[in-house]
């Protein structure tokens, strides 16, 4: 199966530590013999910190996006290092390049691509480009909620939801660089257009990637 996996930066680099990179590398390496794997890595707190400084310096939102993209690519390089020879050694900067290097049979790891595209959007566009069978979005919560469960204990969890319903919930949310929450609008439009089977899963435990593949946890997004 061809799978695109997006790992939020808040998951993989919540602290400047090698441990999460190593743990995800071990899980991904255990899957590579059975699946074609593409991984998109987010920027996390380092990206937000750099973007915050850039805004204080008067940078435009487009420039802030560029800075965030640079950080995601650094995170991608760290994961590639953890994966060793099983990963393609370079970080593709666009979707065509990602598709081309997939011919090597190695795990393809990339960061951002262009301004105004979150990690979710990059993952969804990549999934369409490589004709993925599944996209798994690894985030800091158990799946999709109607509002932030960290702020609202009574937030409703959805084990299953359509992309159209998610768009209704997310209408009006913040789309500035470094502020994406829950799931990105562009990603949802891509999922709906391309019929990409998608799961949203808590990535704080790397083992949850295996549980998601077994259908045990997370939110399934129906592409309609």
UniProtKB/Swiss-Prot annotation:
Origin: domain of life: Archaea
GO CC list: cytoplasm
A Pfam family annotated for this UniProt entry: AA_kinase
Chain residues that bind ATP: 9-10, 44, 48, 139, 145, 148
Gene3D superfamilies, per database record: Acetylglutamate kinase-like (3.40.1160.10)
Disulfide feature: none
GO biological process: 'de novo' CTP biosynthetic process; UDP biosynthetic process
Localization (cell): Cytoplasm
Keyword Ribosomal protein found: no
Binding-site list for UMP: 43, 65, 113-119
Gene Ontology MF terms in the entry: ATP binding; UMP kinase activity
EC main group: transferase
Stretches assigned to coiled coil: none
Regulation: Inhibited by UTP.
E.C. code: 2.7.4.22
Pathway: Pyrimidine metabolism; CTP biosynthesis via de novo pathway; UDP from UMP (UMPK route): step 1/1
Keywords linked to the UniProt accession: ATP-binding, Cytoplasm, Kinase, Nucleotide-binding, Pyrimidine biosynthesis, Transferase
Catalytic activity: UMP + ATP = UDP + ADP
PANTHER family in alphabetical order: URIDYLATE KINASE, URIDYLATE KINASE PUMPKIN, CHLOROPLASTIC
Family: Belongs to the UMP kinase family.
Subunit and partners: Homohexamer.
Record's function text: Catalyzes the reversible phosphorylation of UMP to UDP.
NCBIfam families: pyrH_arch
Name this protein carries in UniProt: Uridylate kinase
């Amino acid at each position: 199966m061809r799978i695109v996996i997006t790992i939020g930066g808040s998951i993989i680099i919540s602290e400047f530590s090698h441990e999460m990179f190593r743990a995800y590398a071990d899980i991904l390496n255990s899957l590579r013999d059975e699946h074609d794997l593409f991984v998109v890595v987010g920027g996390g707190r380092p990206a937000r910190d750099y973007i915050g400084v850039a805004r204080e310096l008067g940078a435009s939102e487009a420039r802030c996006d560029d800075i965030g993209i640079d950080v995601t690519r650094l995170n991608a390089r760290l994961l590639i290092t953890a994966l060793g020879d099983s990963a393609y050694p370079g970080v593709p900067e666009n979707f065509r390049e990602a598709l081309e290097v997939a011919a090597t049979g190695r795990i393809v790891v990339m960061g951002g691509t262009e301004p105004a595209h979150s990690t979710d959007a990059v993952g969804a566009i990549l999934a369409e480009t490589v004709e993925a069978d599944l996209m798994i979005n690894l985030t800091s919560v158990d799946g999709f909620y109607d509002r932030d469960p960290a702020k609202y204990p009574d937030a409703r969890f959805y084990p299953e939801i359509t992309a159209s319903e998610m768009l209704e919930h997310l209408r009006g949310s913040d789309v500035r660089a470094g502020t994406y929450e829950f799931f990105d609008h562009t990603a949802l439009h891509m999922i709906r257009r391309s019929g990409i089977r998608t799961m949203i899963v808590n990535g704080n435990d790397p083992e949850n990637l295996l549980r998601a593949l077994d259908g045990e946890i997370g939110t399934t997004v129906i592409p309609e």
